[in-house]
């Protein structure tokens, strides 16, 4: 029983043939209609098995997990497989797809991921990033996601008065090509607000990691037209971030950034973070400025003291 429901037609079977364990679980009732099959090979020292789950109806509202019903009950197909040199998962629900694959078994993947984190944390402690070393420590894996308007994510967001045209994401890691990926959402509507395109990209080479994100509203947007971007770059010994805003008339409203460089030499040569404001002629609230005599820095000492030398003049007086 679950609440007022009498759950019937639930069946579990299993078998052992040699070293292969198999199991099958089925459910056919008002709350859950599904079939799950799994197998696992006990003969190997590494995880070796797979599972598939086909859910044709799962009512989250009736289960008390959602305050109001969605457009359709939850239905999805999920499969996962772990072999000696491969890990793969696949989820499909309506027009939503999620895939994760790696060119290694479960245990090597965990070891590689842990090693990458250790290398990254050591470099952060040393305040100097070696992107070539970071790339060598990366596991080879790909994560991808895509969704339209007919899937549980869209149905749930609709209950919150949020909608979108489509969403997609693909990120990959490998020693050969580093960390690369992109993500985008088109025609995102929240109540009366509409954002035409939201995007994010990342690309790593042997010397740096470049990041770019932004929001773009095209000429047909019912509210306002603009392009706003964040551009960043993480290099070996410094990082930079710039924000740029251009309105529908092509006029720059904001162009402003900061460069951050750790100073670690000590003995009067620095022990903190030096921030340099960029570019040489920033734009703030549609007004162009310039820094007088290179007065564009802020120094954050590790002893919590702050030193600054900023002098900006506007070209408009």
Segments (PLM) and residue ranges:
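Interface amphipathic segments
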Residues: 1-317
């Amino acid at each position: 029983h679950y609440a007022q429901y009498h759950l019937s037609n639930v069946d579990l079977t299993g078998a052992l043939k040699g070293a292969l364990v198999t199991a099958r679980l089925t459910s056919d009732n008002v709350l859950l209609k599904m079939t799950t099959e799994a197998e696992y090979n006990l003969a190997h020292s590494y995880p070796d098995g797979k599972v598939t789950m086909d859910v044709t109806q799962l009512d989250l509202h009736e289960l008390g997990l959602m305050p109001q019903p969605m457009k359709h009950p939850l239905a999805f197909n999920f499969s996962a497989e772990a072999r000696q040199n491969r890990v793969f998962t696949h989820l499909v629900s309506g027009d939503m797809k999620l895939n994760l694959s790696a060119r290694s078994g479960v245990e090597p993947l965990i070891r590689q991921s842990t090693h990458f984190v250790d290398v990254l944390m050591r470099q952060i402690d040393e305040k100097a990033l070696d992107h070539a070393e970071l790339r060598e420590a990366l596991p080879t894996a790909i994560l991808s996601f895509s969704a339209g308007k007919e899937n549980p994510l869209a149905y749930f967001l609709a209950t919150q008065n949020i909608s979108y045209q489509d969403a997609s994401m693909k990120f990959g890691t490998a020693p050969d090509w580093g960390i690369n990926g992109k993500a985008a959402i088109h025609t995102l509507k929240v109540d009366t607000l509409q954002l035409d395109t939201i995007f994010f990209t990342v690309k790593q080479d042997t010397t740096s990691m470049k990041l770019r994100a932004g929001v773009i509203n095209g000429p047909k947007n019912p509210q306002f037209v603009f392009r706003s971007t964040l551009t960043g770059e993480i290099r070996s010994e410094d990082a930079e971030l710039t924000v740029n805003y251009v309105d529908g008339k092509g006029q720059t409203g904001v162009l402003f950034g900061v460069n951050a460089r750790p100073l670690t030499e000590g003995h009067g040569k620095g022990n903190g973070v030096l921030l340099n404001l960029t570019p040489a002629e920033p734009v703030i609230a549609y007004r162009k400025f310039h820094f007088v005599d290179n007065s564009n820095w802020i120094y954050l000492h590790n002893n919590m003291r702050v030193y600054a030398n900023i002098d900006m003049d506007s070209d408009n007086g």
